[in-house]
């Protein structure tokens, strides 16, 4: 990925360190909004119709939509993805992790607008008579686009990088990342098959960053020597866990797409 190396040299200094912390912080704020005043969340969704009518903050605020309604599950999810995200950032470097996460977000936004455009074109005659239908279609689309699959892309990327890393499922059952990733992939494929086109586009576009990552890293010769060193160094550190610092001590209690 020579283009990425060149891009990093040019704008790498603008990368956001500890991006996963900011992402988890956004989820937390969204959870607070949803708890205190649920109506606020309707103004945060990724609704193309409302964005095109001036509510441009939705291009960013959809990231605040809570991925969990249960506080306990939210805390577990936050701990799990914090450790995975920080591990990927240490392995890839801050810039590349930024590209991966922001790339997933950009693809998600593009997917929402593409789907809205298709639906609008298919229902143009009806919308001309019932303008409110455009907003309803947009809200329907927005419900399928969230950070759930962005989170999954983090999990899948980590599983590809460290397939033999072990986690404790339900804090009891030891299981390797590759087996959990297979379960995630099967569940996602099933969801893709049974969903309508809105769901399919949402899943595909949200995971497009992972698809690109997977096909561009299957051959590790594509890694630069510096990247290989970072990866090997992190693996070495993970083999020597310190109290409270190892991913091997983390479990995720409910196995579904987040």
Give short role names for the model-derived ranges.
Residues 1-11:
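Short, Lys/Arg-rich, polar N-terminal cytosolic tail immediately upstream
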């Amino acid at each position: 990925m020579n283009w990425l190396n060149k891009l990093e040299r040019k704008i790498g200094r603008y990368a956001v360190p500890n991006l996963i912390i900011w992402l988890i912080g956004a989820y937390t704020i969204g959870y607070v909004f949803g708890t205190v005043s649920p109506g606020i969340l309707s103004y945060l969704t990724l609704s193309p119709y409302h964005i095109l009518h001036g509510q441009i903050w939705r291009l960013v605020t959809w990231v605040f939509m809570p991925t969990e309604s249960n506080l306990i599950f939210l805390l577990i999810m936050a701990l799990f993805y914090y450790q995975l995200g920080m591990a990927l950032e240490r392995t890839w470097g801050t810039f590349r992790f930024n590209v991966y996460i922001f790339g997933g977000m950009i693809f998600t936004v593009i997917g929402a607008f593409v789907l809205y455009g298709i639906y609008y074109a298919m229902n143009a005659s009806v919308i001309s008579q019932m303008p409110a239908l455009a907003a309803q279609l947009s809200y329907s689309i927005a419900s399928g686009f969230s950070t759930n699959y962005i989170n999954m892309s983090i999990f899948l990327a980590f599983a590809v990088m460290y397939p033999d890393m072990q986690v404790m499922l339900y804090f009891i059952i030891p299981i390797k990342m590759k087996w959990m990733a297979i379960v995630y992939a099967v569940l996602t494929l099933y969801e893709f098959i049974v969903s309508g086109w809105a769901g399919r586009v949402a899943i595909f576009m949200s995971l497009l960053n992972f698809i690109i990552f997977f096909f561009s890293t299957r051959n590790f010769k594509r890694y630069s020597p510096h990247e290989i060193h970072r990866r090997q160094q992190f693996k070495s550190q993970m083999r020597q866990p310190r109290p409270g610092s190892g991913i091997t001590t983390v479990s995720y209690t409910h196995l579904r797409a987040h």
